Amino acid sequence: MIGLKKVILTFFVCLIGVGGMENVWAGDKTVRDFHEFELWHKLLQYGLSPSGEWAMWRIQAGETTDTLFVRNIVSGKEYKYKETSAPEFSKDSRWIVFSEPTGEDVAAGIAYQVKLVCLADGEEQIFRGIESFTFTSDSKCLILKGKNAGDAVELNLYDLEKKRIKNIANIQEYTVDPTGKYLAYTLKAEKGLSNSLEVLELNDYRLLFLENDKNGYEKLKWTDHGLLFMKVLSDSTGQKQGRE
C-alpha cells in the first residue's frame, strides 16, 4: 500500500508539473519541437504540504533560471516565484518559506533573502542576512539563523500569528523541544568567562530558566523527559578536565 501511494503521488505531481510548463513555452503551438520535451526532465523538486492541500514543485526552464510553483489542489489557486531554493511548508500547511536572490549587485556574489508567504492571501515577509530557517513543529514560530560571527550566531524568532520578531545574539548552541514550544540555548560570554544556559518559551518569549556556572555548558539535546546537557568540569586552576 505504501508503495502504491508513492506511485500515485509521483504521477500526480508529474501531471501538475507538466501543467505548469504551459507558462514556459511561448505561444500556443499545436506542434511541439522535439527538443522542448527536454524541459520535462528538469523537475528539480516537488512535494505536498502536510495537510495534502498544497503542492509545490520547481522546474528549470533554462540553463540557470527556475520557477517555484505552489498550487492549491482543490481550488487551483497558484503562486509562482523565480530562482528560489530550499522551500519548506509549515506543519499546519498555512505557510511556505524559501530563499531567493535579493536582486542587488554584490561584489562578493549573489545576495540572498528569505521570503515567508501566507498561503491564504499571498502576504509576504522578507528577512535579510539569514543563513538557514525552519518552522517549529507547532507552526507558531519561524526560526531564522543569522550568519556565523566567530563561534556564535544570531537567532531571529518570528511569531507567525502576532507578526513580531525577537532577536537573540551571541548564541553558541541551540535546540527546540519536540513540541515546538521551548528554545534552549547557550550564550557566549565575555572573554575569560563561561557561557550561560537559558530556556525560552516561544509563545510569549518568557525566560523560564537561567543557569550560570564557572565551567559552562554544551551539547544541548531535548528528549521526551526534558533537556539534557553537558557541564564542563575544571580543576582548581580553571583548566578544563572533563564533562558531566
Where are these regions (language model features)?
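Blade-terminus and WD-like Trp-Asp/Gly-His loop motifs, strongest in beta-propeller folds
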Residues: 46-54, 87-96, 133-142, 174-183, ...
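Short coil/turn segments at the loop-to-beta-strand junctions that recur within blades
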Residues: 41-43, 82-88, 127-135, 169-175, ...
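Bacterial N-terminal signal peptides
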Residues: 10-20
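Short loop/turn segments that connect beta-strands within beta-propeller blades
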Residues: 72-76, 118-122, 158-163, 201-205
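Beta-strand-rich domains and repeat architectures in extracellular enzymes and scaffolds
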Residues: 34-68
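A flexible loop/linker signature enriched in serine peptidases of the S9 family
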Residues: 59-67, 100-113, 124-127, 145-154, ...
